[in-house]
Amino acid sequence: MKKTLALLVGLSAIAAAQSAGAETLKVAVAQRGFWNSTFIDIGLKQGYFKEAGLDIEILYTEGGASTLTPVIAGSIDIAMTNGILGVVAAYAKGMPVRIISAEATGAAEAFWYARPESGINRLADTNGKTVAFSSPGSSTNLILLQLINQAKVAPKLVATGGAPGTLTQVMSGQIDVGWSVPPFVLQQLADGKLVIIARGSDVAALAEQTIRVNVANVNALKEKRDALVRFLKVLSRSIDWAYSDPHAIDNYAEIAKVPRALAQQTRDDFFPKQALQLSEVKGPRRHPETGARVQVHHRADDRRGGAGNVGHSL
């Protein structure tokens, strides 16, 4: 596993991209409505991609395999916000996918919840209960494995897909504990209809670990490398805008279709900007399921603006 991870994130520096004509990139974006799924939309609205000579075609997915599969098949150039376990598994099987940047470090945004009448108030109450995560290999899969190992409990883990569908399953009694990321479920929590029983931030070991990455198809790396460099630079610029421009919250409230106050809470309380840095990929010391010791640590040379490196060196 250590060798696999070391190879997987062998990011190699390349020269900064020169100005070029508009080039199309097809991008899969997971979980529309999440704060970190809006950065491509920001880049389009602000004209950043146009300035960089890029046309972006977006495919929105529910995350996990639905994001990773099309990039492996080659129908998509880039897949955003992939759980690192799923990417490692795909690479280990020889799939044509490579990490191009970190996406999320730490797990401040994810949480697990239950209905108050269920009697489940903390993770320790979940022995034999059904506890949700989005999909195998996703970041919620990784976080939940760490949480249950830390709490020493034995729930039944269930892949439930996206946050809206998971909420429906909890409210209808199909599962005991759901997962979410803001702004989803915040209103139900405020209304007392649900209670948080665990947070990703409860796992100290994840605070400095990359849990999600952005990846590209191998052929895209070979044929569109210059465009991928420009894409990452625009992504970095869009993230900066989202944390500095006063209109960012209004923009997000409109996209997520939530009140402005919930949009503000989502960004300020659950998505610290430093967690969304792109240049440094860090890995776990031990695999959460096998216990095998692994280590990933790569810091891209960001002297050319923080996104002049695209990884493939395999």
Task: Describe each region flagged by the PLM.
Residues K222-A300:
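Secondary-structure end/capping motifs
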Residues S19-G21:
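Signal peptide processing junction and immediate N-terminal pro/mature segment
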Residues M1-L7:
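Bacterial N-terminal signal peptides that target proteins for export
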Residues P164-I255:
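Pocket-lining segment of extracytoplasmic ligand-binding domains
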Residues R293-L314:
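C-terminal solvent-exposed extensions
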Residues E51, D202-A207, P272-E280:
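Short, solvent-exposed loop/beta-turn-alpha elements that line the ligand-binding surface or hinge
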